[in-house]
Amino acid sequence: MSISSDPIPTTSAVDVIEKIVYDFVKPLGFRRFRRTLHRFVEGDISQVIHFQNGCPQKGIPGLLWVNLGIRVPECQEKTFTPSLPLKKYYQEYQCNIRTTLSFCTEGKDVPYRLWKSPQKIAADIICKLEQSVLPVFDILNSRDAILKYREDYPRFDQMNHLVLLEAAMIWGRRGDFPEACGLFRRYYAQVMEERKSASENGRKIYLEKGQSLSYLNERTGKTETVLAEKSGYYTIFHSPQAHLEYLKQLASQLNIPLENL
């Protein structure tokens, strides 16, 4: 069956699905803002369920993604003094802990097809939320819990390489600068080591058939071009410098010394 490009049926279907799901989570403190269901815990930590109708950037209509997120202000803003006042709600893309419902439950990206029964889709979403999402929301409902248990839920946290950095932000907001400084420096040293390993041993990148990539080989000092004869992973000996430079700037803003690393 072809996917309809008519936006009206899919929009109506998502309206039905969202209303059914919202009626289920509303007693738990969630409030609806457009396609976002949002609640605050511990005063300013956001927990978010977002309904994404299609993927316009890729020209994919007729599919529904359910995106999930948790936003800790200092982690998302990368500062010890987050901005005030709080907004009424925050979007999933503004969260620092993010995943999708399908990745959380199945470990892969499986959107819903909106030409199926909206009521059945909503029932499936509620079942998965009840079994796999709301219990995690209830555990990761405070800064203490996030520091202690975040790494227990890797499927819930597709940005989990930032755990140390964001723990530093939490400790910094609490006023424990030595702990924040130590965690930040550990993360910075980890990134430097990963960059060194990528330069010496290579790192994998995915290219579609026919794609090409020109880069500076850090082992030879020469520019090389990789042409993908088939879709798959290719090894390059180069590690981007941008994230390391960003961390240097952030350390300067936070008055964290990076000497002797």
Describe every region a protein language model picked out.
Residues 2-13, 39-261:
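Intrinsically disordered, low-complexity regulatory regions enriched in serine/threonine/proline
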Residues 10-32:
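Amphipathic alpha-helical segments
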